[in-house]
Amino acid sequence: MSNQGSRRNGPVKLRLTVLCAKNLVKKDFFRLPDSFAKVVVDGSGQCHSTDTVKNTLDPKWNQHYDLYIGKSDSITISVWNHKKIHKKQGAGFLGCVRLLSNAINRLKDTGYQRLDLCKLGPNDNDTVRGQIVVSLQSRDRIGSGGQVVDCSRLFDNDLPDGWEERRTASGRIQYLNHITRTTQWERPTRPASEYSSPGRPLSCFVDENTPITGTNGASCGQTSDPRISERRVRSQRHRNYMSRTHLHTPPDLPEGYEQRTTQQGQVYFLHTQTGVSTWHDPRVPRDLGNVNCEELGPLPPGWEIRNTATGRVYFVDHNNRTTQFTDPRLSANLHLVLNRQNQQLKEQQPPQVVSLCQLPDEVECLTVPRYKRDLVHKLKSLRQELSQQQPQAGHCRIEVSREEIFEESYRQVMKMRPKDLWKRLMIKFRGEEGLDYGGVAREWLYLLSHDMLNPYYGLFQYSRDDIYTLQINPDSAVNPEHLSYFHFVGRIMGMAVFHGHYIDGGFTLPFYKQLLGKPITLDDMESVDPDLHNSLVWILENDITGVLDHTFCVEHNAYGELIQHELKPSGKSIPVTEDTKKEYVRLYVNWRFLRGIEAQFLALQKGFNEVIPQHLLKAFDEKELELIICGLGKIDVSDWKSNTRLKHCTTDSNIVKWFWKAVESFDEERRARLLQFVTGSSRVPLQGFKALQGAAGPRLFTIHQIDASTNNLPKAHTCFNRIDIPPYETYEKLYEKLLTAIEETCGFAVE
C-alpha cells in the first residue's frame, strides 16, 4: 500500500505499445515458439501480458497498456515461449529489455523504437537474439485512434543498401546481395554495390540509427535535434525503396504542372501557365533515360513494359488502365537515382512541350500508345506476378479416387495452408500409375468441378431454366457444413487460375463482378433474369401511380415453400410510390443477387483470395475474369486444325483427313469430350489452341500415327496433348474407335 501511495505523489501516465518482435531465437529444431510479451513496472505491482502469437519468430501484437510511472520506476519487457513456461522456473525465456528512468524519459513521445533483446543477467546461459519494437506516449499525446504500422519496415534500415535478410528452412538467418546475387552468413556492414564495384560512391541512405539497448538505458532515446527528424525522413524513404511490394508516393509536380489523362488512357502533363502539354514527366530530368533498370528494382504490381511499333519503350498501368512513357520507378525514386549518380539537381527549365492538338501526323509514333483491353498481355502480367509467389521447392500432392473425388479432395485441400496450394500441383488417382506433368491435374479439375458445381449437391443452382449458368443456392444451409464447402470451392477456383488450368462450368456475369468487388446494378439483371429486369425497367420508366399495388416486400420459393422477405424494416406495410420506386428497384436488385447468400459468397471469396490476392485482379473486368477461370467454352475447329502438330503423318494422310471429318461431325459436347480425352480439359485457353500447355510449357495438340493393331483404341497422352491413332483401314472404323475411346475409357498409366 505504501508503494501505491508513493506513486500517487508524482507518477505520470504513459501508454506503452508493444508492436512486434523480430528474429527471435529458435530453441527447438522442429517447432517455432508461441510468443507473448510480458510488461512489468518493477516494484509497483503493474503487470500485463500480450496475446500469444503461435508458431513464429516474428510475432506481431500491436497492443497497448496504460502505465503509472514514478520518477525512479523502471519497465521490464520480456518475451516468452508459451509452450515452455509451465515446465520449470525461467523456462521459455526468449529475451528482455529493461528501461530505466532516464531511458523512459528519452524514449517518451519519439515514436516506435527498436530495442535489442538481452539476457536476464550476465551469468544467464540462455541464448537470446532479436529485437522488440515499442513506443511510449505521454497521456496528453494519446489520440483516440491507433496508428497503423507496417512492422517489417521498422527493421529494413538495419541493413545497408542492396541487402536483404532471409531465413533458411532451419531458421538460420542469411543475407542476400541483390547486386552480386550472392548470399552470406555474416551480417553486412557496407552497401551491396561496394562488393562488386569498390570505386562506386556510397549510397546516401546507408544511415543507420544507433541501436537502443535495454540493459542500462544509457543509449536509449533520441533528442529533438532537427537533424534526427531529417534522418528519419530519409530512412523512411530508404525503407520504401527497399520494399519489394510498395511504390511510395512520388514527389509533388513542379509548380504550374498538372497530371492529366486522355480519354484513351494516356497520361500527360499540362503546364497551366502556358497551356502546353508534354508526355514527359517534368519531375524526371530527360538525361535519366539511360538509368540501369536493375538499380530501380521491379515494376510496381500491375505495371508492364511494352514497346511501340517503332521500338520505343512505354509503361502500362493495368490498375488504372493508363499508359505513359516515364518509368514509374523513376518518378518515385528520383532522389535515390540522382544521389546514386552523385549528381546535384540543378534548376531545370520547363521541359520542351508540344500541344496535343498541334501534334503532327508524322510524329504520331511518338504518342503514348492508348490503353487497350489486351487480355493476353494482362494475363501474361498476372502469370508473372503469380510465378513470383510460387515456392521453388516442394509439391502440393493430392491423391484421390475417382469414385470419391469430391469428398477426398475436400478433406485434403482444406487441411492445407494457403501457401501450400501455391506449390507445384501433383495429382494422383488411386490405383493408377500416371505421372502428373499437367494432364492429370487438368483431368482432376475437370472431374472435380463437375461434382462440386453440380446442383444435385445443393451448393449451386441454375440461374435460369434455359441457360445453364450457375449461381449460389440461397438454401444451401440444408448442408450444415455448407460454408466450409464454399471455402473449398473458392480455393479450387484459385488453384485453377494459379496453376494455369480451368474450371469446367460457368457462373453468371454478376458473380464474377462480385468476385472482383464491384457493385451490382440493374443492368446486371438482364442476363440473369430478363423478365424481372424488364419489369423493373418498366417501373422506372413509367408512372406507377394507381397502377401497381406493390409494397417493400417480395416473395420467393424455397423448396416449394413460399417465403416473404421485407426489403426494409416493416416493408410489408410500406407501399411503393412514384417517389420511392427507385429505392424499391435498388433494394430489389440487391436482394435478388444477395438473398441469403452473403455468408456463402464471403466464404467462397475468402478461399479464392487465399490463392489469388485480390489486388492482382484489378486490371480485369468480369468478362475477362470469366475467361481466366473457365477458359473458352466454344471450340473453334479451324483454329484447332491450324494449331495441330502431325507426327509420322501428313495433312494428306487418311488418318488425319478422317480425324478432322469425325471432329466436324461431332456436336459441341462430343468435341469437348474429345478435347478432354486428349488434353485433360474440355476448355480452350483464352488465347486459343496455340496456347495449349504441356509438361514443360506450350505444346500443340498432336496427332500421332502409330504402328499398332487396328483393333486397338486410340490412346491419349494428356501431359503432351497427343493422341496416338493406329492406321485404321476405313473412316467408319476410325469413327467407331474414336467414339468408344472418348465415351468409355478413363484412367492413367505409365508406359
Curated annotation (Swiss-Prot):
Q: Which domain of life is it from?
A: Eukaryota
Enzyme Commission number(s) of this protein? 2.3.2.26
Polar residues bias locations: 214-226
Q: Which GO terms describe its biological process?
A: negative regulation of BMP signaling pathway; proteasome-mediated ubiquitin-dependent protein catabolic process; protein ubiquitination
- Ranges where the WW domain occurs: 157-190, 251-284, 297-330
**Which UniProt keywords are listed?**
Cell membrane, Cytoplasm, Membrane, Nucleus, Repeat, Transferase, Ubl conjugation pathway
Active-site positions on this chain: C719
Q: Name one GO cellular component term.
A: plasma membrane
Every copy of the C2 domain together lies at 1-119
Residue segments, region Disordered? 214-236
What pathway does the UniProt record associate with this protein?
Answer: Protein modification; protein ubiquitination
Where found, per UniProt?
Nucleus; Cytoplasm; Cell membrane; Membrane raft
Q: Which top EC class applies here?
A: transferase
Q: Which SMART domains does the protein's record reference?
A: C2, HECTc, WW
| Principal subcellular localization | nucleus
Report the catalytic activity: S-ubiquitinyl-[E2 ubiquitin-conjugating enzyme]-L-cysteine + [acceptor protein]-L-lysine = [E2 ubiquitin-conjugating enzyme]-L-cysteine + N(6)-ubiquitinyl-[acceptor protein]-L-lysine
Please state every residue range assigned to the domain named HECT: 417-751
Q: Which GO terms describe its molecular function?
A: SMAD binding; ubiquitin protein ligase activity
Its function?
A: E3 ubiquitin-protein ligase which accepts ubiquitin from an E2 ubiquitin-conjugating enzyme in the form of a thioester and then directly transfers the ubiquitin to targeted substrates.
Protein name per the record: E3 ubiquitin-protein ligase SMURF2
Q: What is the lineage of its organism?
A: Eukaryota, Metazoa, Chordata, Craniata, Vertebrata
